[in-house]
Amino acid sequence: MRHKIKGRKLNVTSSHRQAMLANMAVALVTHEQIKTTLPKAKELRPYIETLITKAKKADLTVRRSVLSKIKDKKAVEKLINILGTRYKDRPGGYTRIIKAGFRYGDLAPIAYIEFVDRDINAKGNI
């Protein structure tokens, strides 16, 4: 029985899953919108939302905690300086998932995950 077991396995090892979520979080912070499979997007959502909630506080302890999760200094700077201030008054729900059909090769469900009040001109700019 799987009682109180959170998260999805995504058919990868735990270290692969942690690295994948960290890399996807960096991509989402950098581009503010990414395209991925629906289960990965659903796993990324609580991961990135906890990071943004921490980044709203913006002190040294938070910076070190976020840096231990995503390992990219430029993404951490953007997360704390830009996204933390952008969502300072929002109590949660910083991302949205938009279903985008199915992938041609294997019919995997595809989705976009993006920030709610995203800057459309921020594609790839840190």
Curated annotation (Swiss-Prot):
InterPro entries per the UniProt record, alphabetical: Ribosomal_bL17 (IPR000456), Ribosomal_bL17_CS (IPR047859), Ribosomal_bL17_sf (IPR036373)
Provide the assembly information: Part of the 50S ribosomal subunit. Contacts protein L32.
Q: Which gene encodes it?
A: rplQ
Q: Name one GO cellular component term.
A: cytosolic large ribosomal subunit
| Top-level taxon in the UniProt lineage | Bacteria
From its record, what is one biological process in GO terms?
translation
Q: Does the keyword Ribonucleoprotein apply?
A: yes
Query: Hey, which family's this protein in?
Result: Belongs to the bacterial ribosomal protein bL17 family.
Q: Does the record carry Ribosomal protein as a key word?
A: yes
NCBIfam families in the record: L17
Q: Keyword annotations for this protein?
A: Ribonucleoprotein, Ribosomal protein
Native organism = Rickettsia felis (strain ATCC VR-1525 / URRWXCal2)
Protein name in the entry: Large ribosomal subunit protein bL17
